[in-house]
């Protein structure tokens, strides 16, 4: 189930039931916010069916697509439109957060993926989500931050 309210969104899922892909079109308030587009794309990537995402606000909001593909997502981009065909499972991979919203989508995809997902560039995610790994861990997610010293 998915609930999208004025100030929040909730997604409930179980491994026994695949959710249905959704179509969204971003536009200025009060329409669907561009800041949630990447997370919905991660949701559609593992949902049943095909979701169409139209990005009307920012031209560069699909930067996370190559990394979702690396995890097994079936996504095709044509200009400002992404076609997301749901797959039964994603696979852990080494990916890079190139921006805050795309990075959070990679975290969500990584939580659902089979195997280990390593995300570099998490400093960008930190800008918008304080202690996100602690929050997700408190909800039962298997996630940890590992510092890498060069």
Language-model segments: which ranges?
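Structural motif
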Residues: 14-57, 83-127, 144-150
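His/Asp/Glu-rich mid-to-C-terminal helical/loop segments that flank catalytic regions of hydrolases
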Residues: 129-130, 140
């Amino acid at each position: 189930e998915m609930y999208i309210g004025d100030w929040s969104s909730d997604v409930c899922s179980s491994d026994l039931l695949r959710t249905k892909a959704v179509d969204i079109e971003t536009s200025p308030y009060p329409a669907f916010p561009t800041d949630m587009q990447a997370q919905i794309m991660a949701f559609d990537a593992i949902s049943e069916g095909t979701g169409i995402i139209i990005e009307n606000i920012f031209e560069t909001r699909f930067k996370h697509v190559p990394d979702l593909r690396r995890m097994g997502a079936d996504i095709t981009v044509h200009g400002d439109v992404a076609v997301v065909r749901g797959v039964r499972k994603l696979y852990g991979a080494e990916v890079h957060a190139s921006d805050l919203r795309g990075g959070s989508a990679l975290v969500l995809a990584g939580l659902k993926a089979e195997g280990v997902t390593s995300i570099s560039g998490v400093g960008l995610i930190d800008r918008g989500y304080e202690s996100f790994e602690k929050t997700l861990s408190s909800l039962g997610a298997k996630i940890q931050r590992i510092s890498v010293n060069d």
